[in-house]
Amino acid sequence: MSGSTGERSFADIITSIRYWVIHSITIPSLFIAGWLFVSTGLAYDVFGSPRPNEYFTESRQGIPLITGRFDSLEQLDKFSNPF
């Protein structure tokens, strides 16, 4: 017979009231925090991705496609330059 590690069983944890009191607060809080992170636009700023209205500018309406293998840095500079 093997020894006990002293840890609570999974069934004992998920049937406890303390587990559900804690998780009934944290799970909705994480959902609301994620929704606010995306809906306020902070996710665009943190990760540096363009907002949906910034993909195409007035001066550049085409797809920014890199075609050259050896001059790719120059093409990237041209695409990232708004003027």
From Swiss-Prot:
It is found in: Plastid, Chloroplast thylakoid membrane. One of its GO terms (biological process) is photosynthetic electron transport chain. Keywords: Chloroplast, Electron transport, Heme, Iron, Membrane, Metal-binding, Photosynthesis, Photosystem II, Plastid, Thylakoid, Transmembrane, Transmembrane helix, Transport. Heme binds at H23. This is Cytochrome b559 subunit alpha. The keyword Endoplasmic reticulum does not apply. It is a single-pass membrane protein. Its cofactor is heme b. InterPro entries: PSII_cyt_b559_asu, PSII_cyt_b559_asu_sf, PSII_cyt_b559_CS, PSII_cyt_b559_N, PSII_cytb559_asu_lum. GO terms for molecular function: electron transfer activity; heme binding; iron ion binding. PANTHER family: CYTOCHROME B559 SUBUNIT BETA-RELATED (PTHR33391:SF9). Heterodimer of an alpha subunit and a beta subunit. PSII is composed of 1 copy each of membrane proteins PsbA, PsbB, PsbC, PsbD, PsbE, PsbF, PsbH, PsbI, PsbJ, PsbK, PsbL, PsbM, PsbT, PsbX, PsbY, PsbZ, Psb30/Ycf12, at least 3 peripheral proteins of the oxygen-evolving complex and a large number of cofactors. It forms dimeric complexes. The chain crosses the membrane at residues 21-35. It holds the Pfam family Cytochrom_B559a. With its partner (PsbF) binds heme. PSII binds additional chlorophylls, carotenoids and specific lipids. Belongs to the PsbE/PsbF family. This b-type cytochrome is tightly associated with the reaction center of photosystem II (PSII). PSII is a light-driven water:plastoquinone oxidoreductase that uses light energy to abstract electrons from H(2)O, generating O(2) and a proton gradient subsequently used for ATP formation. It consists of a core antenna complex that captures photons, and an electron transfer chain that converts photonic excitation into a charge separation. One of its GO terms (cellular component) is photosystem II reaction center.
